A protein has these predicted regions:
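Active-site beta->alpha loop and helix N-cap motifs at the rims of alpha/beta catalytic domains
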Residues: 1-145
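Catalytic alpha/beta core domains of metabolic enzymes, predominantly
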Residues: 124, 128, 139-217
Length: 217
């Protein structure tokens, strides 16, 4: 399982997904990226927005899972993403359930959702997957903090990736509410390096994601 101590043990790298000139997923180039990151001591890889999984073809999803799982070391935690559409994630659930990934991040859907609907949809996906998910909060209207807390208490969430951009990250009423209802040890800063210090020191978040470490771990 993904524990708070595991979240604290490594920066969370968010690598790109390498493709060939014909747009097929590249085994060799992804192996190079993963090996480079691991050589720098990074032990957690999260494949989501930077890997452009919002637009992955359903027909290549199983191949993606095999490649990123097969190229990473035994001590590396690899987390794939699903969605963002409900139908997409439910179709991806069987492949994930058949894999050994301990968790998967649900990419946030923008628009045409309600907080209650998000809770219901993520609950159904978590049950189909059979394991807790990563709740990715990117926009204030996506899910209310209290509903996020309900998901956590239900056991359906491994951790929360918080990524609402603020002009001043120290002034964040949503995050103020979130850490009141969810243990901050289960929340990571998910916007890169710039707000990470404030998120770690002021809000006591467990860790942070980084794209830069994919270049210079």
């Amino acid at each position: 399982p993904v524990t708070p101590s595991l979240l604290r043990s490594s920066v969370i790298a968010v690598p790109p997904l390498a493709r060939e000139a014909d747009y097929q997923i590249s085994d060799e180039e992804n192996r190079k990226i993963i090996s480079h990151i691991e050589a720098g001591g990074i032990k957690t890889l999260l494949y989501g927005g930077n890997a452009n999984l919002y637009h992955i073809r359903p027909s290549e999803y199983e191949s993606l899972l095999k490649i990123i799982a097969g190229e990473a070391g035994e001590d590396t935690l690899v987390i794939p993403a699903v969605g963002p559409a409900y139908g997409t994630m439910m179709d991806q659930a069987p492949a994930l359930k058949a894999s050994a990934f301990p968790t998967a991040m649900v990419l946030p859907m923008q628009g045409l959702t309600t907080s209650k609907g998000v809770v219901d949809g993520l609950t159904q996906f978590a049950r189909a997957f059979g394991r807790p998910i990563v709740l990715y909060i990117k926009n204030p209207g996506y899910i209310e903090p209290e509903d996020a807390a309900r998901l956590v208490k239900s056991g359906h969430v491994s951790f929360i990736k918080y990524a609402i951009v603020r002009d001043d990250p120290s002034e964040d009423p949503y995050l103020d509410r979130l850490v009141q209802v969810v243990d901050s040890k289960l929340i990571v800063s998910g916007i890169g390096e710039q707000p990470a210090i404030v998120h770690r020191e002021q809000f006591k978040l467990a860790g942070f994601t980084s794209g830069c470490v994919c270049l210079n771990p």
